[in-house]
C-alpha cells in the first residue's frame, strides 16, 4: 500500500510586508521546507516559505514512510508583484529546492525524496485592485526512496 501526501507552501519576498499581509501569512514564520543553511532570520535569503498545508513539515520523517515507494506532491506557490520579479524569485527557489532534494545529511526530513517531474504554470491573482499579485506554481511529484537495508535471516 502506497501513501500519497500533498504539501502546499507559499513563497514571497521577505521584505514585501504588504504582500505578505495580503497573502495572510504576515507573522507565520515557521520554516516549512528548511533549505540548507537558510532560515528566515538569514538576511541573505530574500524570500520566506511558509506552510499552508500539512505533511512532512509537521514532524513526519522518512521513517514514517517505510515500506512501499510513496509519492509526495509538493506545490510551492510563488507570489510577487511583477512577472519579472516572480520569474527571478521562482528561479532562486527552484535552484534551492533542487539543492535541498540532493542533500544527503542524516536528519533532513525530506532528504530521501527524489523529484521525478515538475511543471510550471502562471496564473494572475489580484488581492487588491491597485496591487496585482502574480503567482507561479512549482509542482514537484516526488518519490520517497526506502533506503533502509533489509536484514538477512540467515
Model-identified regions with their sequence ranges:
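Residue-level signal for secondary-structure boundary sites
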Residues: 58, 84-86, 146-150
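Short, charged, surface-exposed interaction patches
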Residues: 40-69, 111-132
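Small/polar-rich, solvent-exposed N-terminal microdomains that initiate assembly or binding
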Residues: 1-64, 100, 104-106, 150-154
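Conserved acidic
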Residues: 1, 5, 85, 132
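Acidic-leaning, charged glycine-interspersed low-complexity segments
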Residues: 95-154
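Oligomerization/assembly interface segments of phage tail-like spikes and tubes
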Residues: 67-84, 132-145
Amino acid at each position: 500500500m502506497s501513501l500519497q501526501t500533498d504539501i502546499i507552501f507559499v513563497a514571497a519576498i521577505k521584505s514585501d510586508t504588504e504582500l505578505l499581509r495580503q497573502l495572510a501569512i504576515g507573522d507565520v514564520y515557521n520554516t516549512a521546507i528548511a533549505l540548507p543553511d537558510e532560515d528566515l532570520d538569514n538576511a541573505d535569503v530574500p524570500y520566506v516559505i511558509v506552510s499552508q498545508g500539512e505533511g512532512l513539515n509537521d514532524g513526519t520523517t522518512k521513517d514514517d514512510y517505510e515500506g512501499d515507494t510513496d509519492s509526495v506532491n509538493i506545490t510551492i506557490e510563488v507570489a510577487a508583484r511583477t512577472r519579472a520579479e516572480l520569474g527571478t524569485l521562482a528561479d532562486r527557489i527552484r535552484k534551492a529546492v533542487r539543492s535541498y532534494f540532493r542533500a544527503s545529511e542524516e536528519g533532513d526530513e525530506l532528504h530521501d525524496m527524489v523529484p521525478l517531474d515538475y511543471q510550471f504554470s502562471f496564473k494572475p491573482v489580484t488581492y487588491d485592485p491597485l496591487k496585482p499579485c502574480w503567482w507561479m506554481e512549482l509542482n514537484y511529484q516526488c518519490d520517497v526512496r526506502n533506503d533502509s537495508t533489509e536484514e538477512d535471516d540467515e
